[in-house]
Amino acid sequence: MRVVTTAQPLDVQPTPLALLLLGREADPKSERGVECPGDLPSPSDPDLVERARAAKEKLGDKVFILGHHYQRDEVIEFADVTGDSFKLAKDAAAKPEAEYIVFCGVHFMAESADILTSDDQKVVLPDLAAGCSMADMATAEQVAECWDALTDAGIAGVTVPVSYMNSSADIKAFTGKHGGTICTSSNAKKALEWAFEQGEKVLFLPDQHLGRNTAVRDMGMSLDDCVVYNPHKPNGGLTAEQLRDAKMILWRGHCSVHGRFSVDSVNDVRARIPGVNVLVHPECKHEVVAAADYVGSTEYIIKALEAAPAGSKWAIGTELNLVRRLANRFAAEDKEVVFLDKTVCFCSTMNRIDLPHLVWTLESLAEGTLVNQIQVDKETESFAKLALQRMLALP
């Protein structure tokens, strides 16, 4: 199974534009993790705002722009809808009249949109180098080797794969082919409950922290019920006995942004802001989740702040762009919202989608040139869609 990424044609140049062409003929795996230079990148040239508006107006209903919560403000301004990756993919599928789906997010999100939309719709990623370090931590070859290890241990037949939405199309297809389902950070508990009705064990991909937090915090398992499979070690670094004894086989993957938060971050913010409520994403480490007051997805975080009383104080452990927008939004309601960590840190691959890339994309489409199309091959799409459909059927 393979994922085909196309950018066609490559010889078209828009009008003069300060554009870093990393997303054209670039390796999507060339940049991983996060950068913490101390501040967010400077806003792009304000003259580009009018060009973006003009190109979008020219395209009209032919284009539908999706903006992930972690995108820059200058990109979110032009999004028709915002949300998490699964919500945006569903929004795209519900807009069949749009010929072009411009996904302002990262590579696996655009793949999911291509899987769920019709063949007539074309999904475009403004910068092909906007990858995801977590999704890159589980390749099809590595997961196949893991399944072989489970087979050798005699447990593959009783193991159900559950893959996080933040995974490649190949991993989603593997999951569908082997009787598993996809999950989001919002429905991970339901997905695990379903999986344990189908089998005795779960192989959770690729985020170990979401898998562990859901199993222990939400389902009452112990940490001893969980083992971590390291794809860079023979047999995952585990004995056959360890695999047979485990209920949760967690892939050794993580989100580089959420992985930065620590218990020290929690203790420090409590010392600095008396009475603060600490709210973190379940992609954080287990000890951070245990030290927090509340845990939930990006949608949960937004709703929690909407329902919070005036005068309340909140430290949020998730991506900086979203936290900054929430801080600005709720300041008018006398709600103090701060970033959990003192170190200013954002998702560098999300931030590759900037206004210059968006303008280049929209102007190219307006001129009739298809660029940076994301296409998932039919076999991969078929099995990946099966896994997604199982998730949609969860109670």
What role is predicted for each listed range?
Residues 2-317, 321-395:
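Active-site loop-to-helix "anion-binding N-cap" substructures in soluble metabolic enzymes
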